[in-house]
Every structure is written in structure tokens, then in C-alpha cells.
Amino acid sequence: NSYSELLTAAIDKEAAKKQAFDEVRKNFSDFLAKRKKNQPFFYSFNPTNTHRTWVQGSGKALWNLNPDDLKGKMPPVVPDVPEIREDMADYLGEVMAFDAACAALVTMLQEMGELDNTIIVISGDHGIPGFPRGKCNVHDFGSAVPLAIRWPKKILPQRIVKVPVSLIDLAPTFLAAAGLESPDDPDGQNLLPALSQGGDDAKLRGWALIGRERHAGAARVEHNAYPVRAIRTPDFLYVKNFKPDRWPMGDPYKVTDTSEPTFAELVKNTYAAFPDMDMSPTKAWLVNHRKDAGMEKFIDYAWGKRPEEELYDLTKDPHQTKNLATNSSYSTTLTKLRDQLMSELKNKKDPRLENDAFDRAPYHTKDQRK
């Protein structure tokens, strides 16, 4: 955790790097020391360094990632400008730090002789924080995360699943790997039939549900959520925004027609404006340049209010920039996905469908901010 902060503050960078990875190895060693001989184990490694904050310019300083190399390669939902490219490079540096830590753990397993006897799963939990359509959004930039699984002799090497799956699928997958049955009507699905010899995507559901309620507690004056549910198929994303009158990234707070927080404040204080978007140089740049020519679409991607329904054709619009919910040519698809989503939510007794239960106690309390 705090990888770029630790190394940036250190006089001896190599010593600081060694300290960081020694801590990773020691935590794993301490865990294994409590293990009986040949006892199965489950170890979860969850560093937070890819969450804000990280040091501005650290991608280049620590990992030799030149932000200019990203020019022309940025997702179309953000302006391709130096400040935002640098922010992206810094994020990628934190990802590389995570990769290096994982490599240290894999090396330990190899030295123990347990590498080929261990299921290794590597995943993210959400998209990049502090970016439009990133963390806290159900669009792919915010919800599509890496998921890689290694289990020699059990999972086909380089097998790529091309239909959406979810991290809730890991629990039934682990139970199946251990020879145990999942509870009746599990939320997730066992992925092994699609990963093992003879596996194919047709053995999976073929879709995934995505949802959010709230992120920052006081993102809105009365602690109101921004409830969203979505269904992702290989070809489409359907989104249901239950409260389209609310700001999706939180209330503007200090951003008005005539005033705004400083760049420095927006980089350090998530609550300065639109608190469901984490503090970042990208967020600060967008706020400070929101009135510039050509910025309207980027501001809309970042925190503009959204319609009750969104529909995206991923074969034609992989970055989900063209909402087709009102396009009559897609009315059949819209109805089908809407019905499928609502059916699944009702089947799982989603509290949002029970008279907006998430807006009342115990899920909700009034904020005291004035």
C-alpha cells in the first residue's frame, strides 16, 4: 500500500522498494507459519495502492512510463491532454507495483513447491478512480476489471472467456474446486465447466449484473444514494438509473456558475465537488476547464445527469458513448434486457425494488451538512 508515496519520500529508493516487497513476503510467511503440513489454505492479498491517492508524476519517475506515449490512446470519455495522460500513467505505475508484488508471492509458492498445487486468481475490483466513467460507474470503464485464473492440469492455458462473468462467481467456483456443493440458488455461477478441458462459453450464463447505491457517504446533502442497476451481455449494456433527477457523481457543492474550488483543493479533497468521483488531477482539470470550448461532452460523461434508461450496442460502440435507449431500431433489445434485469432483481429480492428500501434505515441516515 502507498507504494508511490513510500518510494517518493525515500532517500534510498532501492531500499524503500525492498522494504515494500519484504513486507508483502513477510505477511505471507507469517500466514503460512500457522499452516499445518499439507493443510489447504486460502490467502487473500488486497493492496490498496491503485486507489487514490498516488504521487503525481510517479509513473514516469518510478516506472519510466512516459505520459506522452499515451497520446492518442486515451479512452474517448476523457480529454487527451497532458495532465490527464500523466494521471493515467501514474495509475498504471501503481498497477505495475501490484504486479510486482504478485510476482513476489508466486515466487514464494514456487520455492515452496506449491505453485502447481495452488489456484491463483488475480482480479481488480473496479475501474480507475477519479476518472469519468471510472470507479462508481456501471459502464465498462468503471466495472470491467481483469480476471485471470491459473490452475495447472485443471484449467486450459490461455483459455479466454468471451462472455461477461462476475467476481461473485468466484465463491461457487472455489467451492466446486474443493469438491463442495454451493447453497441453493447461489448468486454466482461455477466457472470451472467453462475453464476445464472441453469447456466453452455456452456453459455459462452469458451475462452479468452490475449495480451501485452509494460511494462517498455525504456525496449528496441528505446522504441519498444514486441507485443504478445494469445487465451486461456480450453485445449490449442496459442501464437503469432509478433516480435520474440526482447527480450521478454527487452534488456539485463548491462548483457553481461563478465559482469553483482550486486545482489543489480538488486534488486533495474528494468532498470539494462531486464526491462520488475520487479526488484526482483529472477531476481537478475537468472542473477548472469545464467551460472551455469542446468540453461539454466530457463534462457530461464525468458528472452530467443521466436519463432513466441507457442502452449501448457494444459491437458498434465499445466505449459506450451513444445511448440508444430512445432509438426505435433497438426497442426490442431494450424491452428484452429491461425485462431480464427486472426479473433477476425481483428474484433476488433487491431492496431497491421494495419501495426504495435503500433510502430508509438501516441503509440510510440523514446527513447533518448544511
Q: Predicted regions span which residues?
A:
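Acidic, His- and aromatic-enriched active-site or binding-groove loops in soluble protein domains
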Residues: S2-L32, P67-D69, W207-I210
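Short Pro/Gly-enriched beta-strand edge/turn motifs at strand-loop
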Residues: P129-F131, A208-R214
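Short, hydrophobic secondary-structure boundary micro-motifs
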Residues: P157-R159, N323, L353-D356
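His-Asp-centered acyl/peptidyl-transfer active-site segments
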Residues: D201-G206
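Bilobed periplasmic-binding protein-like "clamshell/Venus-flytrap" ligand-binding domains
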Residues: R338-N355
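Short, charged, surface-exposed hinge/linker loops at domain edges
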Residues: E354-Q368
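Surface-exposed loop and adjacent secondary-structure segments within mature catalytic domains
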Residues: N1-S2, T48
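Active-site-proximal cap/lid insertion segments
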Residues: K13-A16, F31-P186, N190, G199, ...
